């Protein structure tokens, strides 16, 4: 963030939405559709695509999902200097059930190793002065 003019800081979760097949259960039914998501990450990417200087502050696992977010943020031109990587906890996967009419219902999480998820362990950080 040094030397950059950040207009917006998006703080929060970066996760995977695991969409099950229509009328199926994303925990057990195939095929599933994994999508990078999380409202703060989505907003950060949208703002960057509009040309707004933005930094994302959050925490992801040191796993394939975390690597996908690092890559996505780089491709979108986001400042990810406040993105933390967790070597112990995994990135969060949200199970999303889709009704036959397309409505979505969030039904829980996948990948829990009984130690929580990376986004739950966000460490305090120094933010740039306003």
Q: How would you describe each model-predicted region?
A:
Residues 1-78, 120:
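Glycine-rich phosphate/adenosyl-contacting loop at the front of the ribokinase-like
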Residues 53-130:
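Conserved N-terminal subdomain of the carbohydrate kinase-like
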């Amino acid at each position: 963030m040094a030397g950059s003019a950040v207009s917006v800081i998006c703080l929060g979760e970066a996760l995977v939405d695991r969409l099950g097949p229509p009328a199926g259960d994303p925990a057990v039914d195939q095929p599933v559709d994994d999508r990078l998501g999380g409202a703060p990450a989505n907003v950060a990417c949208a703002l960057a695509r509009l040309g707004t200087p933005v930094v994302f502050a959050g925490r992801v696992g040191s796993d394939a999902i975390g690597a996908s977010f690092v890559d996505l943020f780089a491709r979108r031109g986001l400042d990810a200097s406040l993105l933390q990587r967790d070597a112990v906890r995994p990135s969060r996967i949200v199970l999303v059930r889709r009704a036959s009419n397309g409505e979505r219902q969030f039904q829980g999480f996948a990948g829990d190793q009984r130690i929580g998820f990376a986004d739950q362990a966000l460490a305090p950080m120094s933010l740039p002065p306003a």
